[in-house]
Amino acid sequence: MRFLAIALLLVALAGCSKPAEPTNNQVVATPEVGPHKGIDRSHKGAPAPDTTFKNPDGGDISLAKFHGVPVLVNLWATWCAPCVKELPTLDKLAQSHDVDGALGIIAVNQEDKPNTAVDAFLKTTIKARSLGAYQDPNMALMGKLGPDAVLPTTFLYDANGKEVWRYVGDLDWTSPEAARLLSEAGSPVPAPKG
């Protein structure tokens, strides 16, 4: 009996070792801690994907629009607890760059929801003042990440549209760690004030 209990426990734990592979309409949220959370520089120098997604006005946009300035791209969803946890700090970072323009910051929702619903979520739940309701309802950006894609994932692209790093999981974007990571954009990116 004890052997059976141990065997069942091992099978259950093995199922938890890797997130499920997303389908076209499924994305996995990252664990709060674990092997999938942290900085990934293995794609350094890769060009930004040329896929299109929706800007806050509902029009098509691509990351090429941000060429000439480093850009931080956060992929998130309303149902993703780590995403919701980090969005207020990402908004605070975005507020600090509204004036200086040293860093473009966009949060791209990965759900097939009306733009008005995503915008309302950002304004009422997150209390966002600077993050616009960018959307990728077809999850084209997530699709570029491969079968192990999880939310949130945040990318830093340099002014030439080349990936510097990606951060898997939530991060306090107002922290000294985030400021250090953002400084890798190729030009000084000041930490948010306050």
Report the location of each language-model feature.
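A short beta-strand-turn-helix
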Residues: 40-45, 50-71
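Loop/turn elements at helix/coil->beta-strand transitions in domains of secreted/extracellular proteins
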Residues: 68-70, 101-104, 129-130, 159
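Structural microenvironment flanking redox-active thiols in thiol-disulfide oxidoreductases
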Residues: 85-126, 138-144, 194
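Thiol/disulfide oxidoreductase modules built on the thioredoxin-like
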Residues: 123-130, 135-184
